[in-house]
Amino acid sequence: MNILMTSVSRKVALVNAFKQALAEEVGGQVIAIDASPRSAALYFADKAYIVPSGLDQDFLEAVKGICQKDDVQLLIPTRDEELPFFAAIHESFKRIGVTIMVPEPGVVKTCQDKRKFIYFCIKHGFRVPITYEKPEDVVQFPVFIKERMGKGSKWTFRVENASELDDLLARLKDPIIQEYIQAPEYTIDLFADFSGQVLSVVPRERLYIFGGESFIGRTSKKWEIIQEAMQLAQALRLVGHNTIQCFWHEEQVKFIEVNPRYGGAANLSFASGAFTPRMLVRLVLGKKVEPCIGQFKDRYYMLRYTEDLFISEQEMKQIERFHQDRAL
C-alpha cells in the first residue's frame, strides 16, 4: 500500500509516523510532495516529488499522475488551503482507487469559516466564547479578535481597549470579536472512521505555544472534554484525523475551532497510545478498527525541539519534478 502526503513542508514526524504504520501493518511507501525542494520532510519519505505550486489544474494533474504512476491508495492533505480543493474532488479520486482523508465540502466550509463554526456550535448546543456581533456590544476588555477565515495564529490579537479595537477593525478584512478567555487551552486529536464513528479521542493541554503550535503539551483524560468532542464530531460529520481546539473555562468546554487534518503536535497522541496513522491504514485496507476511547497514557508530556537537516545542493536537485505533461 502506498500513501501520498501533500505539502509536507517540515512535517517530518508525520511522514515517519506513516512509514511506521505501513511497516507494522502491510508494507509500502510514503510518497511526499511539496512545491519547494527546501522542504525537510521530503528527505524522510520513501519517495518525493516537487509539484507545481497553487491549487490549479497543473497541481491536480500532477497529483493524479503520481497516484496512478505509484499506485497510491491513500492521500493525506496536510495544509488548510488544500482541504476544500480535495473535498471537492475526492469522489473522482475514488474512481481511480484513491481514498482522500477529507470530509465533505460542506463540513470543510463550516470548519474553516470561523463565523459559520460559531453559529453551528450555538445551533447544536455547544458552548463557544462570547461573540460580539458589533464593536459597540463589547462590555468588557480585553477582548480577542481574529479574522473570519484566518489560519493558525495569524491575524489574531488580544485587544486592551476601544481605541485598539477601532484600529484593528479598520485593518482586518472580516474580523470576529470574542471575549478574551484566560483558561487552560486544549487541542483534541479525534479520529473517526469513514462512516463518522469516533474511534479515538486524546485531549492534550497546550502548556507552551509558539507561532500557533504547541511546543510543550500534556495529555489529559478529561472526560468532559472527550465526551463533548465526540458529540461535536458526530454533529459535524467528521471523518479521519481532526484537530479540535477548546478552552476549559468555568468548568465548561468552550470550542474555538476544528481543523479536519493532522495538527503539528499530533505525535504526542501517537506516542501516548492513540496511533491513528495505523488506524487509518487499516480502514483503507478494509480491516476492522475497534474504538479505543480513553485508551492512552494520561499526563504524558511532549517537549518539542528543533533538529537540523544538512543536505547538498546536488541532493536537492535529485528530487524529481512532476509536471502536468507527465500526468497526462
Q: Where do the PLM segments sit?
A:
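ATP-binding N-terminal substructure of ATP-dependent carboxylate-amine bond-forming enzymes
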Residues: 1-101
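Short, charged, surface-exposed secondary-structure boundary motifs
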Residues: 42, 59-61, 108-113, 155-156, ...
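A short, glycine/Asx- and small/polar-enriched loop/turn
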Residues: 44, 138-141, 249-254
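ATP-dependent carboxylate activation and anion-phosphoryl transfer catalytic cores
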Residues: 70, 221-328
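Active-site nucleotide/adenylate-binding loops and adjacent lid/helix of ATP-dependent enzymes
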Residues: 105-183, 194-197, 223
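Short, structured loop/turn "capping" segments at alpha-beta junctions
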Residues: 128, 199, 239-241
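Phosphate-binding site of ATP-dependent enzymes
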Residues: 157-237, 247-248, 252-254
